[in-house]
Amino acid sequence: VIAMVRCTQCGAASRPVGGGMVLQGHGTRSRQVRGPAQPGQQAQVRVVQVRRYRCQACGGTCTVVPWEVTWRRLYSVAAMAWALALWGLVGMGMEAVRRLVNPWKHTGASEAGRWRTPLRWLRAVHQGQLLVQVHTMRPWPPHWHPRKAAAHVASVVAGYAPPAAPSPPLSVQAFLGAARAQ
């Protein structure tokens, strides 16, 4: 069980020395996570339970989520890294990547043949809101073409993958390294 160390709103310690609990359990809620559980598996929508805490000092709430869940994103962080790797490193078309990562088989007419979501992910990485280690350790120039930036992000994230013998393809390493790059 993971507990919060401090309030994300006011910074109060969850349990100050000699004091009572400041962050108290405030129930759970369901959260969707989209994408495959492992590279090459069928993309799916999974529902996970996340734990909520309420701060007795400021009244704010905070949520503890599994490693694969990231703030304001429906896809798992591993699925996002894998999609960027497939597009940037492997050279797959965006529609082919979408079929592997997106659990929805049908799209609206305005989205036929394209998928803009990975470009939003790239922007979030560049702004330090997603895969923070990439932005911190290896930022890229803003004039780079999005596919080149995606390859760069995937390469950096792959470096965080745990060692394995034999070494899996770089796109799989990006999937596996995403949690550590977050």
For each predicted feature, which ranges?
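Extended alpha-helical scaffolding regions
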Residues: P163-Q182
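Short, positively charged, Gly/Tyr-enriched micro-motifs
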Residues: Q56-A154, A161-A164, S171
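Short, conserved DNA-binding cores of transcription-related domains
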Residues: V1-V69
